[in-house]
């Protein structure tokens, strides 16, 4: 939700309050997906729990219309994010299970790009809507979106996932592997820098005088190139290992976040930085998701994706979003974005030195 921070700012919340509220989406990812992931792995009924989580996400969000204080919005956002944060890992697990069964792992990016297309449409439309109708129009648009997600859950065929092995194995031996720890740590460092981006980028641009339409356009540029990289990923994965893709993505992240902080007054540089989103999110996400699927399989696949979401987007995102809010108070927006480039820089060396696997995606 690239404009949610702007809506919260319109309610006269300060940077620390906005950071705390937006970090609820990341904090909920630490524990909520693991509960539903465990239930889904036990039953194999992923679609059933996608329906449940999307239903409660929609119902709870309606409470935002009667909330204008920090405490009230905190309660609504926390309750809603518990369910919405659980939907995506379940959908990822279902998708990867289907692709793995057909030995078409590299096709994941072609499916994921539809989410990016939806983001572009939403970013452009909402930017214009906010310019014309004000920030409050955002909550009506988001309510409609939540309802559509709920309806789409019922279009999915009621298929139960059958695991290739019936033996119940503990997940702890997988979690204790050095390569798994290294992968999750480097992913968390990458997402920490993005936590700052997702929470404060729109506010940063608005404070620099950019219009809602311009902000929407910049977000859309990033996601447009994200779609392009998704289309190219099968070819990229046929030539590079997943580790190489992750390292290249981390390198681009260092450059991107420094540029955002140092040259926010240059639209050309900002566009260049947004183009790098293709690597810092697009290729990085595809490669990390497939490595997680490589380590966590069969009856652990939903929990594997949930743990990935919890540690990277949960812990990592919360550190970046909440910690970023505190840093902005003392260092300012521009300096905080430049400093955030240190996180993927560390992640690069953690991954380079600690991940030894040469695993490549299965192609078909």
Feature locations, PLM:
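Helix-loop junctions at membrane interfaces in 12-TM secondary transporters
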Residues: 65-77, 261-273
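Helix-to-loop junctions at the C-terminal end of transmembrane segments
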Residues: 31-45, 130-131, 228-241, 328-329
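Cytoplasmic helix-loop-helix junction between adjacent transmembrane helices
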Residues: 78-114
């Amino acid at each position: 939700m690239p404009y949610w921070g702007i809506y919260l700012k319109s309610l006269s919340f300060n940077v620390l309050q906005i950071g705390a509220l937006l970090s609820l989406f990341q904090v909920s990812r630490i524990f909520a997906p693991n509960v539903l992931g465990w239930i889904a792995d036990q039953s194999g009924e992923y679609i059933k729990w996608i329906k449940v989580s999307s239903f409660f996400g929609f119902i709870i969000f309606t409470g935002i219309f009667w909330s204008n204080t920090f405490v009230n919005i905190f309660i609504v956002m926390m309750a809603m994010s518990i369910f919405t944060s659980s939907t995506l890992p379940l959908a990822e697990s279902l998708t990867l299970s289907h692709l793995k069964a057909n030995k078409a792992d590299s096709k994941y990016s072609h499916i994921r790009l539809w989410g990016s297309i939806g983001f572009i449409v939403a970013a452009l439309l909402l930017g214009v809507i906010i310019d014309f109708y004000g920030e409050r129009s955002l909550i009506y648009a988001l309510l409609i979106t939540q309802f559509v997600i709920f309806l789409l859950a019922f279009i999915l065929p009621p298929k139960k996932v059958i695991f290739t092995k019936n033996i119940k194995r503990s997940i702890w031996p997988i979690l204790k592997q050095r390569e798994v720890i290294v992968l999750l740590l480097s992913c968390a460092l990458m997402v920490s820098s993005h936590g700052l981006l997702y929470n404060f980028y729109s506010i940063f641009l608005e404070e620099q005088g950019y219009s809602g339409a311009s902000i929407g356009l910049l977000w859309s540029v990033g996601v447009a190139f994200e779609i392009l990289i998704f289309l190219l990923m099968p070819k990229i994965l046929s030539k590079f290992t997943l580790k190489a893709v992750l390292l290249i993505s981390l390198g681009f992240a260092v450059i991107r976040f420094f540029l955002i902080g140092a040259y926010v007054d240059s639209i050309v540089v900002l566009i260049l930085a947004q183009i790098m989103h293709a690597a810092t999110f697009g290729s990085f996400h595809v490669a990390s998701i497939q490595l997680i699927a490589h380590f966590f399989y069969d009856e652990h696949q939903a929990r594997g994706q949930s743990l990935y979401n919890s540690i990277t987007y949960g812990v990592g995102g919360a550190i970046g979003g909440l910690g970023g809010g505190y840093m902005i108070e003392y260092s300012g927006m521009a300096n905080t974005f430049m400093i955030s480039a240190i996180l993927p820089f560390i992640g690069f060396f953690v991954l380079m030195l600690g991940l030894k696997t040469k695993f490549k995606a299965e192609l078909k």
